[in-house]
From Swiss-Prot:
Task of the protein: Cell division protein that is part of the divisome complex and is recruited early to the Z-ring. Probably stimulates Z-ring formation, perhaps through the cross-linking of FtsZ protofilaments. Its function overlaps with FtsA.
PANTHER family cross-referenced by the UniProt entry: CELL DIVISION PROTEIN SEPF
One GO cellular component term: cytoplasm
Assembly information from the UniProt record: Homodimer. Interacts with FtsZ.
Gene3D superfamilies, per database record: SepF-like protein
GO biological process: division septum assembly; FtsZ-dependent cytokinesis
Protein family per UniProt: Belongs to the SepF family.
Location in the cell: Cytoplasm
Record's keyword terms, sorted: Cell cycle, Cell division, Cytoplasm, Septation
Name of the featured protein: Cell division protein SepF
InterPro entries: Cell_div_SepF, Cell_div_SepF/SepF-rel, SepF-like_sf
Amino acid sequence: MGLMKKFRDYFLEEDYEDYEEEYEAPQPEEEALPKTAGKANVVSLQSVQKSAKVVLAEPRVYAEAQEIADHLKSRRAVIVNLQRIQHEQAKRIVDFLSGTVYAIGGDIQQVGTKIFLCTPENVDVSGSISLDGEDDRPMKRW
């Protein structure tokens, strides 16, 4: 051990002499304040209303259906106007969006001629709209 002492004295001579062992006295623990469980679960109704959004979409090609589905996945309601797209493409978009709303637990409703309302599960829609010329007859596949 003599070699180690010489080595330590040579390299740590100044630091070793000034070294004082620091000792911290244990501090008394502060009393923990009881947390109120009720406040953590309260959500302001005003903040919920501000975050709700409705997106208007008027796709021109089938590929834009993916963007509409992304809005639905982000919990936004989408009104889709299919009046400016060919009938076959519009049917494909409705089929795609029907699968999307089914997967997320949402709903799709026709609110006008070639106009659909797609909603995620967090949006409730009440009431119904009768289309022109249709009273209580079952809806035909448009």
